[in-house]
Amino acid sequence: MTDLVVRRLLIDLETPFAARWNGGDAFRSAFFSALSMSFPVGEQFFIDSVREGLKKLPAEQQAQMAAEVKGFIGQEATHRRIHELFNKHLSNMGFDNRFAARAIERIQKQAHLNVRMHLAVTAATEHFTAVFADWMLHHPEALAGAEPRL
């Protein structure tokens, strides 16, 4: 299997950005900003699910999967950190992230479910993200005129 490369993305998120950062378009900016607000909670769920899933494997399989899991966790932690920085600016502009608290509450209510269910949700969500990313690559107009550093 191909090794996961954890990219330490260096994006300037110290400098504020405009609320309509996506080409001045209110809808496109709000759409992608709302997505960003949902990501940190989801990424932490993915990390927790994969970490718990690894623990459930027999010792031999744990050893085989450890590096891959470490790479996945590193990648997700990097994404979470970047979205948290982005979301901090959104909050400073007055955007209220009500999704995160509700998502955390739902995740806690489902904590009793089998780790396989959590891994299935993780895999399905990652697949959706990959399909969405592919769509984005084929439709650059979705980010036309966006703040270049974002």
Question: Where are the regions a protein language model picked out?
Answer:
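Non-heme di-metal
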Residues: 1-150
